[in-house]
């Protein structure tokens, strides 16, 4: 194991180098990943986020993995943009069960000018509660990223999904370069980036390596890198894809950790299908972030109490955030709710 792969942050990874990491003996790869992980993080702390779908279904994009796409009949009930107050109530519940970051996702190709004021109010309200804020709203232009940053958004999620070479087999309604441009706008606006991909869509090892190379060779690494295992949903074109080999999934986490040593690597969608032993291996491989709660946008996620029981058995604790005194925090929640109720846009959000 070279020093260059234990502690140094690089942005010049080659396909040959990354494939060599994947092809190491499993235990050697895990040892290397855990060594890198310990050089930058407390190995027994995991960042905990909660994800809420603020607008569900009828998305005009044709992503073959997604039950929210309007192109496929998955039986998903379409919902309009959630009212601001309801979003804040969900954020308060998320904080109460231990989440430190609240992520809000909308099934849009991009947010419209009509939607943006409501979205900005959500960010401000959640931020006032002392939670980190994250959103995934689709493609953004430069002015939208500036507005979100000004409202206090900490993270923007915009996944690359897979390698540039395989991307066209999965999505045709948005280009890879458009995704990279959105990430550049987010970074230029001063926000942190959450960007990763999905395993199990029929991609090759070269594609998995290619995705990680795209992320690791960005001018700055994403602060958060979600690695998703495809959740196969009836009605989507990928519903009959073969399951991902569990060891291959763990290898993906480990290589992500080595390539992006200071990023949080998130064990994301598909965790419901993972047994406790696989999740423990994921943490050993360097995963140090999870989504917490019962629902991950439109598919099941392990129940929160099960997560905490597993954490206790493994000696893992949720990563701490800067805490406000309880009375200060409660006042912030109440003030945020009052401000939303007095806003003209508050009651109209559901009809946006």
From Swiss-Prot:
The UniProt record lists the keyword Iron-sulfur: yes
Protein's name according to its UniProt entry: Biotin synthase
Catalyzed chemical reaction(s): (4R,5S)-dethiobiotin + (sulfur carrier)-SH + 2 reduced [2Fe-2S]-[ferredoxin] + 2 S-adenosyl-L-methionine = (sulfur carrier)-H + biotin + 2 5'-deoxyadenosine + 2 L-methionine + 2 oxidized [2Fe-2S]-[ferredoxin]
Oligomeric and partner information: Homodimer.
Role description: Catalyzes the conversion of dethiobiotin (DTB) to biotin by the insertion of a sulfur atom into dethiobiotin via a radical-based mechanism.
Family: Belongs to the radical SAM superfamily. Biotin synthase family.
The keyword Transmembrane helix appears for this protein: no
Source organism: Pseudomonas putida (strain ATCC 700007 / DSM 6899 / JCM 31910 / BCRC 17059 / LMG 24140 / F1)
């Amino acid at each position: 194991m070279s020093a260059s792969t234990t502690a140094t942050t690089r942005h010049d990874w080659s396909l040959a180098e990354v494939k060599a990491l994947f092809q190491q003996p499993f235990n050697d790869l895990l040892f290397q990943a855990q060594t890198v992980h310990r050089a930058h993080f407390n190995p027994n702390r995991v960042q905990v986020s909660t994800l809420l779908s603020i607008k569900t279904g009828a998305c005009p994009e044709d992503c073959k993995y997604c039950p929210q796409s309007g192109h496929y009949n998955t039986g998903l009930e379409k919902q309009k943009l959630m009212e601001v107050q309801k979003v804040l109530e969900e954020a308060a519940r998320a904080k109460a069960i231990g989440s430190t970051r609240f992520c809000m996702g909308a099934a849009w190709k991009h947010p419209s000018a009509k939607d943006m004021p409501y979205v900005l109010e959500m960010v401000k309200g959640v931020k006032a509660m002392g939670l980190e804020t994250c959103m995934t709203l689709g493609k953004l232009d430069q002015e939208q990223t500036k507005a979100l940053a000004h409202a206090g958004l900490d993270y923007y999620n915009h996944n690359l999904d897979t390698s540039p070479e395989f991307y066209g087999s999965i999505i045709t309604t948005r280009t890879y370069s458009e995704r990279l441009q959105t990430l550049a706008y987010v970074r230029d606006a001063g926000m942190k980036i959450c960007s990763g991909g999905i395993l199990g869509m029929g991609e090759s090892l070269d594609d998995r390596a290619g995705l990680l190379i795209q992320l690791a060779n960005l001018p700055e690494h994403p602060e958060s890198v979600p690695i998703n295992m495809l959740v196969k949903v009836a009605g989507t074109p990928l519903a009959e894809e073969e399951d991902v080999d569990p060891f291959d999934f763990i290898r993906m986490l480990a290589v992500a950790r080595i390539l992006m040593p200071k990023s949080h690597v998130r064990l994301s969608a598909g965790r419901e299908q993972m047994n406790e032993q696989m999740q423990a291996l994921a943490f050993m491989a360097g995963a140090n972030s999870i989504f917490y709660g019962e629902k991950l946008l439109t598919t099941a996620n392990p129940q929160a109490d099960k997560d905490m029981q597993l954490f206790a058995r493994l000696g893992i604790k949720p990563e701490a955030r800067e805490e406000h005194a309880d009375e200060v925090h409660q006042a912030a929640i109440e003030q945020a709710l009052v401000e939303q109720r007095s806003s003209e846009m508050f009651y109209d959000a559901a009809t946006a």
